[in-house]
């Protein structure tokens, strides 16, 4: 993995000043903190928030370290650092599925006495392990359906509410456009964390759960249906033949280049779609993900958290920094400047936020009802089982029926 250190002194607006009055307090003496930030989630914008923190907290310098374009790559790196009890990292940005793992391993410090009631309940729950607060929310997230608003309008099509409707819409537009580079749908088929959500979306839509009370609750029919659905997009020519090689940011890049009609992706993609180099600027709509026929529309809960390394030699300074980064003012700043969904309900009605990103006004119900992936200390094994199976089916290595059978067998060994 290639790692890089980002330093900068870009100035922020006044949006964070009120927060800094709270967090300036007594200065720490010559403390340099290192924070690991997901390279996919706007480290340049986080840098601006950190610059303001430095400006108001004399004696504290913060260095950003990034690495890895997927949740798995980042987790692999952090697992190596934490297993070695390395003190070089003070603050860790963790995928919402990781706090339980890291806390169980003894890799994060607790935030004793912290009140999480101001945050969205889902994230308060995700960061509480065995009654202890082990991390604080960085930003919320859910999967959404991005679509080419201009093309749907051109062909008189409404945003689809079922996957069957999406197929029909894709066929109509693709036939009409006669553009061999235009895909109907892009989603995550590579053996990454996104493929876990790929599998669960139709599975959940049938009203099924995967784990209950820590025990496997596998529904074979729903699993086969899910795998068949995704494979059918490839077989019907709606999705590219090598979808098994497509990761989250590949979907984002292809949609941004104007080569995709519908895309399943997270909120971070919005800012990229509206950028100067985007081919779809002002042509993008956002909707809830479709349902299977007769099922419910549902989505996969995402989001990232900030934890303090148990091996940091600057515990107080690191916790102060995390309190700041998890504050409502920083959450608002990141929503406006990076299109990262807030972890505070009030910000979804904030005039400054909705003026900049209007669709955020309708995003709260989606985030609040999003379903979480299984929470278990053995999540890595659960994830690896699901994503490799999805990838194998999409690559044509196994049938949906064989994939579901193999998935159940492997999961039963993990979740006994």
UniProtKB/Swiss-Prot annotation:
Designated gene of the protein: smoF
Subcellular location: Periplasm
PANTHER family xrefs: ABC TRANSPORTER PERIPLASMIC-BINDING PROTEIN YCJN-RELATED, ARABINOSE-BINDING PROTEIN-RELATED
Residues that hold 3-(6-sulfo-alpha-D-quinovosyl)glycerol according to the record: 40, 71, 95, 141, 194, 248, 303-304, 373
Binding site for 6-sulfo-D-quinovose: 41, 303-304, 373
Entry keyword Magnesium: no
Classification via SUPFAM superfamilies: Periplasmic binding protein-like II
The record's note on its domains: Binding of ligand results in a large conformational change in the protein, and complete enclosure of the ligand.
Superkingdom of origin organism: Bacteria
Signal sequence range: 1-29
SUBUNIT field: The complex is probably composed of two ATP-binding proteins (SmoE), two transmembrane proteins (SmoG and SmoH) and a solute-binding protein (SmoF).
Induction of its expression: Induced during growth on sulfoquinovose.
UniProt record similarity statement: Belongs to the bacterial solute-binding protein 1 family.
Organism annotation: Agrobacterium fabrum (strain C58 / ATCC 33970) (Agrobacterium tumefaciens (strain C58))
Gene3D superfamilies: Periplasmic binding protein-like II
UniProtKB keywords: Periplasm, Signal, Sugar transport, Transport
A cellular-component GO term for this protein: periplasmic space
Protein name as catalogued: Sulfoquinovosyl glycerol-binding protein SmoF
């Amino acid at each position: 993995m290639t790692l890089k250190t980002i330093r900068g002194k870009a100035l922020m607006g006044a949006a964070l000043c009120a927060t800094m009055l709270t967090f300036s307090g007594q200065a720490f003496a010559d403390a340099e903190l290192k924070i690991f930030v997901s390279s996919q989630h706007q480290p340049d914008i986080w840098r601006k928030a950190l610059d303001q923190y430095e400006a108001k907290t004399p004696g504290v310098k913060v260095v950003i370290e990034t690495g890895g374009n997927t949740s798995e790559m980042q987790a692999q790196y952090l697992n190596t650092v934490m297993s070695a009890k390395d003190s070089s990292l003070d603050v860790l940005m963790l995928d919402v599925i990781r706090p339980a793992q890291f806390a169980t391993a003894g890799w994060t410090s607790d935030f004793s006495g912290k009140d999480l009631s101001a945050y969205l309940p889902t994230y308060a729950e995700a960061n509480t392990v065995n009654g202890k607060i082990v991390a604080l929310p960085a930003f919320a997230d859910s999967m959404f359906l991005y679509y080419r608003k201009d093309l749907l309008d051109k062909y008189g099509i409404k945003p689809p509410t079922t996957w069957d409707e999406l197929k029909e819409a894709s066929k109509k537009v693709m036939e009409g456009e006669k553009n061999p580079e235009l895909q109907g749908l892009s989603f995550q088929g590579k053996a990454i964390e996104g493929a876990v959500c790929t599998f669960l979306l139709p599975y959940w839509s049938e009203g099924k759960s995967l784990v209950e009370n820590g025990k496997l609750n596998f529904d074979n029919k729903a699993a086969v249906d899910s795998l068949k659905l995704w494979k059918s997009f490839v077989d019907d020519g709606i999705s590219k033949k090598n979808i098994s090689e497509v990761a989250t940011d590949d979907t984002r890049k292809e949609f941004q280049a104007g080569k995709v009609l519908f895309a399943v992706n997270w909120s971070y993609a919005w800012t990229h779609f509206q950028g100067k180099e985007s081919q779809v600027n002002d042509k993008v709509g956002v909707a809830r993900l479709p349902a299977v026929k007769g099922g419910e529309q549902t989505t996969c809960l995402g989001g990232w958290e900030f934890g303090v390394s148990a091996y940091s030699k600057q515990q107080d300074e690191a916790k102060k920094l995390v309190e700041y980064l998890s504050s409502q003012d920083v959450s608002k700043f990141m929503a406006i400047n990076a299109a990262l969904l807030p972890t505070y309900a009030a910000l979804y009605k904030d005039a400054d936020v909705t003026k900049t990103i209007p669709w955020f006004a309708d995003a709260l119900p989606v985030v609040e009802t999003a379903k979480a992936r299984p929470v278990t200390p053995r999540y890595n094994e659960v994830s690896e089982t699901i994503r490799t199976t999805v990838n194998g089916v999409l690559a044509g290595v196994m049938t949906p029926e064989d994939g579901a059978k193999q998935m159940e067998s492997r999961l039963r060994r993990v979740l006994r």
